[in-house]
């Protein structure tokens, strides 16, 4: 397996080298001189002239057998195309068919012409390739090569590691089986079988060398295109062979090998040559020659009439009568199970706009999947269709295996309903996250009578392996949030497209308008890595002991001991400060530490816990009340975060010219500065706001948080922002704007950043993963968020002074259902006095 994987990865990573080398060998084989003096065959003059040895082609047995072979090839090709149409998208069908049939045909013809010139030009070669080509194997390879996850080379290598041994055994068995035809004694069939054996061998070599390289190359060119991705999720179970079938194939191969050894025994006849008289047909008259020609023409015509009729029938059936359905394929045994889908269509009418009476009609289609029973990647059709076994037997299988891989979906649900399997552990027990989510949806829907509602919640085409034990539990699906972009927004001299995930209309458009006003001048930012905090609450017997404990911690030498214990828990967490709050005999130890590119809550909690264990050695009478005493303060509006900071402290500034204010915002600097003072400063102070001296910073913060996999609940603290506006410039017509955000809690590793979509948004910003220096990427993300907040603040303030807020929300954020028809039938009763 490792050898196959390494070979496949090599071919995928050295695409051009493998392709060029293969084509070079093809060119060499095609250019070799084959027509030597003794190899040129004699041709007969005239189509009606009888030639020696030619009559064998028109023997009755020969014609019947060849017609049967050609028809079988057409039927098998039709079967292959039908199955491929169900396996995946039409693109996999095209690529697998081209590379498995056309490439192998070209290479086999070149090799055959090099060694056996009489085999290279046989007219039944296309039928042979239809009969021996395994297009489904190429489709499986393509589906695995385009699955999500590792890089292209590793995906192709893993697929070849799973398919390589099976392909080797299948090729060996096919060569031995087809080789039996070479012992039939029918000349044409012998030639065809010899050519077919050669075709199988060359097709195998193309599959393990040329095909992986081409597949990797096509995948690189088509990366990011939705239509080129597989229609159903890929699982390694799709490629794993059935061990029982493999053993049967090995037994068959051994038996066929014995047949070949017996039939081809070298001393079965003298010199292995069967001698016999050679009959030649000598025409006696022109009438006999003409009659013989008619007979030959009729036999050939009858042969092709049968084949043409069959081919036309198959084409008509496939094009006009083939029913288009959705199928799910078990890739192990090519068993098909139909999945019927309900389609619910509704056509609501919406009125959108200001005073316009025009109606915008939209049609939405909701697809409700019929989930029971569905063929999952890890369960076979036999398991789904088999009779449900008794509870005791299923329970014994589950306890003996420690898993439910061999149980059907109905049997697993039965164990869940009887409380033998916890509902939250389905993914771990089944070993298949997607199947676990699907069965949980079934159980929850039946238990709470919400089947129809759950069916409307999407769950397919999502990598739940990244969610498990990292982001969410009891998963039943996912909610798609639209992601828009604002920009380009120039920050510190570099333009960025800012991804924002939101369902609030006008937010992205408003932020984009602010970015346009900022223009090429851009935003200048400064970032300070304050560090994440955690504040355990500890209690001492009395205030004297509490005072002694506080003094002990404040001592520099003792602090160094605590810092060493704290820092030992992580490669990145580094303790910066212990700020102590006192309430009677209770101490609140606010540990503040830098955490690299991670947001760092878990790091700081782990370090604080280890520091408390050390402190317990010096103060045995100390009691740990809680690892978090709300003095941190996490996910709550608190002045301590506003004053001392938490996470990243960011300050951004920019200057908007008077021209931009007039043309884009339709206002001036004095108006905006006056509104900012009255609204953001005086109004927030009158309301007693903590860190709320801004227009709507939380909007931009939360939208970017959702898009980039941050903790959305952290927006409570992270949205602390002070927006200031001042007039500036020679004539006092320009506007100087600053945004100060002292507690932006962000990270580019861990948490939701590991998910595919969120990671893509981080990649758009160029801050995915850990930076070259600790906290480099997280600090850059914090500065981009603050700059986006500044752009959004500008746009909203301009909309407020121009009374554009309601108008823009009516246009972008308010879709009113047309209730005119319902309103006509409303009767209003007015009570009499």
From Swiss-Prot:
Subcellular location: Endoplasmic reticulum membrane
Control of this protein's activity: The activity of HMG-CoA-reductase is suppressed by exogenous mevalonate.
Name of the molecule in the record: 3-hydroxy-3-methylglutaryl-coenzyme A reductase
Main enzyme class: oxidoreductase
Family annotation (SUPFAM superfamilies): NAD-binding domain of HMG-CoA reductase, Substrate-binding domain of HMG-CoA reductase
Catalytic reaction list: (R)-mevalonate + 2 NADP(+) + CoA = (3S)-3-hydroxy-3-methylglutaryl-CoA + 2 NADPH + 2 H(+)
Membrane recorded as keyword: yes
Main function: Synthesis of mevalonate for the production of non-sterol isoprenoids, which are essential for growth differentiation.
Taxonomic lineage from the root: Eukaryota, Metazoa, Ecdysozoa, Arthropoda, Hexapoda
EC number: 1.1.1.34
Keyword Transmembrane helix applies: yes
Keywords associated with the record: Endoplasmic reticulum, Glycoprotein, Isoprene biosynthesis, Membrane, NADP, Oxidoreductase, Transmembrane, Transmembrane helix
Domain of life: Eukaryota
Single GO MF annotation: hydroxymethylglutaryl-CoA reductase (NADPH) activity
InterPro entries, alphabetized: HMG_CoA_Rdtase, HMG_CoA_Rdtase_cat_sf, HMG_CoA_Rdtase_CS, HMG_CoA_Rdtase_eu_arc, HMG_CoA_Rdtase_N, HMG_CoA_Rdtase_NAD(P)-bd_sf, HMG_CoA_Rdtase_sub-bd_dom_sf, HMGCR/SNAP/NPC1-like_SSD
One GO CC annotation: endoplasmic reticulum membrane
Any one biological process term the GO annotation gives: sterol biosynthetic process
Primary residence: endoplasmic reticulum
Glycosylated residues in this chain: 680, 715, 720, 813, 825
Active site, renumbered: 504, 635, 711, 809
Membrane topology according to the record: Multi-pass membrane protein
PROSITE patterns given in the database record: HMG_COA_REDUCTASE_1 (PS00066), HMG_COA_REDUCTASE_2 (PS00318), HMG_COA_REDUCTASE_3 (PS01192), HMG_COA_REDUCTASE_4 (PS50065), SSD (PS50156)
């Amino acid at each position: 397996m490792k050898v196959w994987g390494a070979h496949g990865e090599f071919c995928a990573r050295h695409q051009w080298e493998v392709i060029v080398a293969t084509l070079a060998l093809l060119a060499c084989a095609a250019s070799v001189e084959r027509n030597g003096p003794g190899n040129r065959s004699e041709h007969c003059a005239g189509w009606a002239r009888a030639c020696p040895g030619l009559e064998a082609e028109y023997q009755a047995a020969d014609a019947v057998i060849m017609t049967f072979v050609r028809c079988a090839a057409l039927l098998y090709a039709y079967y292959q195309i039908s199955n491929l149409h169900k396996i995946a998208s039409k693109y996999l069908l095209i690529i697998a068919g081209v590379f498995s049939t056309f490439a192998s045909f070209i290479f086999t013809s070149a090799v055959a012409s090099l060694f056996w010139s009489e085999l290279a030009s046989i007219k039944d070669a296309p039928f042979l390739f239809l009969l021996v080509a395994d297009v489904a194997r190429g489709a499986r390879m393509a589906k695995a090569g385009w699955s999500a996850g590792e890089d292209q080379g590793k995906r192709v290598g893993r697929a070849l590691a799973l398919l390589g041994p099976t392909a080797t055994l299948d090729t060996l068995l096919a060569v031995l089986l087809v080789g039996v035809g070479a012992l039939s004694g029918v000349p044409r069939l012998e030639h065809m079988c010899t050519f077919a054996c050669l075709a199988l061998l060359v097709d195998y070599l193309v599959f393990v060398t040329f095909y992986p390289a081409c597949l990797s190359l096509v995948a690189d060119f088509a990366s990011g295109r939705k239509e080129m991705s597989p229609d159903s999720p890929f699982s390694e179970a799709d490629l794993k062979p059935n061990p029982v079938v493999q053993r049967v194939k090995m037994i068959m191969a051994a038996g066929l090998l014995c047949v070949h050894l017996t039939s081809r025994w070298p001393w079965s006849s003298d010199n292995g040559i069967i001698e016999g008289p050679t009959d030649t047909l000598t025409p006696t008259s022109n009438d006999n020659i003409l009659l013989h020609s008619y007979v030959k023409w009729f036999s050939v015509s009858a042969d092709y009439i049968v084949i043409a009729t069959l081919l036309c029938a198959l084409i008509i059936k496939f094009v006009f009568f083939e029913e288009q359905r959705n199928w799910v394929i078990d890739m192990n045994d090519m068993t098909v199970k139909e999945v019927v889908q309900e389609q619910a269509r509704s056509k609501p009418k919406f009125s959108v706009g200001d005073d316009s009476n025009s109606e915008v009609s939209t049609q939405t289609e909701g697809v409700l999947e019929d989930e029971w029973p569905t063929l999952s990647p890890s369960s076979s059709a036999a398991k789904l269709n088999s009779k449900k076994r008794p509870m005791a037997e299923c329970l014994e299988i589950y306890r003996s295996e420690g898993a439910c891989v061999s149980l059907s979906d109905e049997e697993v649900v039965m164990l869940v309903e009887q409380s033998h399997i916890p509902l939250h552990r389905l993914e771990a027990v089944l070993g298949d996250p997607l199947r676990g989510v699907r069965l949980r949806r079934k159980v929850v829907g039946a238990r709470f009578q919400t089947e129809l509602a759950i069916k409307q919640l999407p769950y397919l085409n999502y990598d739940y392996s990244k969610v498990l034990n990292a982001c969410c539990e009891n998963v039943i699906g996912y909610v798609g949030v639209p992601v828009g972009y604002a920009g380009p927004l120039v920050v510190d001299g570099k333009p960025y497209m800012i991804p924002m995930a939101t369902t609030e209309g006008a937010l992205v458009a408003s932020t984009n308008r602010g970015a346009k006003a900022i223009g090429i001048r851009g935003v200048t930012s400064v970032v300070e890595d304050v560090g994440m905090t955690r504040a355990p609450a500890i209690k001492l017997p009395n205030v004297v002991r509490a005072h002694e404990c506080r003094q002990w911690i404040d001592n520099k030498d003792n602090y160094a001991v605590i810092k060493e214990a704290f820092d030992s828990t992580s490669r990145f967490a580094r303790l910066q400060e212990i700020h102590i709050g006192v309430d009677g005999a209770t101490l609140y130890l606010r540990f503040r530490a830098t955490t690299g590119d991670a947001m760092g809550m878990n790091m700081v909690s782990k370090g604080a816990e280890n520091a408390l264990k050390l402190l317990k050695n010096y103060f045995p009478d100390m009691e740990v009340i809680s690892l978090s005493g709300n003095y941190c303060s996490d996910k709550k509006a608190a002045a301590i975060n506003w004053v001392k900071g938490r996470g990243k402290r960011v300050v951004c500034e920019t200057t908007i010219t008077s021209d931009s204010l007039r043309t884009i915002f339709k206002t001036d600097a004095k108006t905006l500065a006056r509104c900012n003072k009255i609204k953001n400063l005086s109004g927030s102070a009158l309301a007693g706001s903590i860190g709320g001296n801004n227009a709507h910073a939380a909007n931009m913060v939360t939208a970017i948080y959702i898009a980039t996999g941050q903790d959305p609940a952290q927006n409570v603290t992270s949205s602390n922002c002070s927006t200031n506006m001042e007039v500036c410039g020679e004539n006092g017509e320009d506007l100087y704007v600053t945004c100060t955000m002292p507690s932006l809690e962000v990270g580019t590793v861990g948490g939701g950043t590991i998910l595919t979509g969120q990671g893509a948004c981080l990649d758009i910003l160029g801050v995915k993963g850990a930076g070259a220096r600790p906290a480099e990427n997280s600090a850059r993300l914090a500065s981009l968020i603050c700059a986006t907040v500044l752009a959004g603040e500008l746009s909203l303030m301009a909309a407020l002074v121009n009374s554009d807020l309601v108008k823009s929300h009516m246009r972008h954020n308010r879709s009113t259902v047309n209730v005119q028809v319902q309103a006509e039938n409303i009767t209003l009763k007015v009570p009499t006095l």
